[in-house]
Amino acid sequence: MNNIMIGRFVPGNSWIHRLDPRTKMIVTFVYIIVMLWASNWQTYAWTAAFVVAMVKLTDQPFKLYWDGLKPIFWLILFTVILQLLFTPGTPILFSVGPFQVTVPGILNAIYVMVRFVLIILMSTILTLTTPPTSIANALESLLSPLKKIGVPVAELALMLAIALRFVPLLMDEMQKIMNAQKSRGMSFSTGGPIKRAKAIIPLLIPLFIGALQRALDLANAMEVRGFKDAVQRTKYRILSYQKIDKVAFAALIGFVIIFFVIKTWLHG
């Protein structure tokens, strides 16, 4: 459980760490949109190369990202199986009961798996190299024009920061509860997937109670510090774009142009 990396910030001084958080959010958003346009192995290879380069620039071991993918392995596997069994087409390779496994089904399964993994990796890069408070400030800055039409941008940014901070906290709490149960003879690593899932059920009530307690503690802490919404606040750190951000935007534009060149030339 403590392998989940989304929401965890790892301090560093890498090229990605030094980028303005707004730059990283824009790059992540544009990348996810571009991923939705990928339709052949060449475009997927190009988007994968971009993520690998980003991972390299974080100066963090790839094993850190790999460990972060392990907790969602079963979700990825379930999605792949759905694509294999429910994608029609020809030629038909073999049948599994009433289901037929086709070549288009295999290709769709591979593409969905790659898309899933790449989007998770890109999102992990954002949270791994950016503190939750910086992500909230970046979101508030990017969405600030919406204040004119009454959108509570500051409150949305605060909720995002709290949610990102609570993800690793809840995972750590889950790990503590699991360790306590293991010390009493409970096993979470034996049996099939269904048995393992049933073993998780007794953990939900103490986890839910712990989450509520943390939420109450946070609410009390905010209240005693005089927190109020819908007020104008100053910032301790003012966000400003630097030369390194211009380089990042240039790289992003180059990535998008090359992507659509590949897609157009290969009739993807």
Swiss-Prot record:
Highest taxon above the source species? Bacteria
Q: Name one Pfam family in it.
A: CbiQ
Please provide, in alphabetical order, the Gene Ontology terms of the cellular component aspect for this entry: plasma membrane
Keyword list, A-Z: Cell membrane, Membrane, Transmembrane, Transmembrane helix, Transport
Chief location bin: membrane
What membrane topology does this protein have?
Multi-pass membrane protein
The subcellular location is: Cell membrane
Q: Which HAMAP family would you find in this protein's record? A: EcfT
Name assigned to this protein: Energy-coupling factor transporter transmembrane protein EcfT
Give the source species. Leuconostoc gelidum subsp. gasicomitatum (strain DSM 15947 / CCUG 46042 / CECT 5767 / JCM 12535 / LMG 18811 / NBRC 113245 / TB1-10)
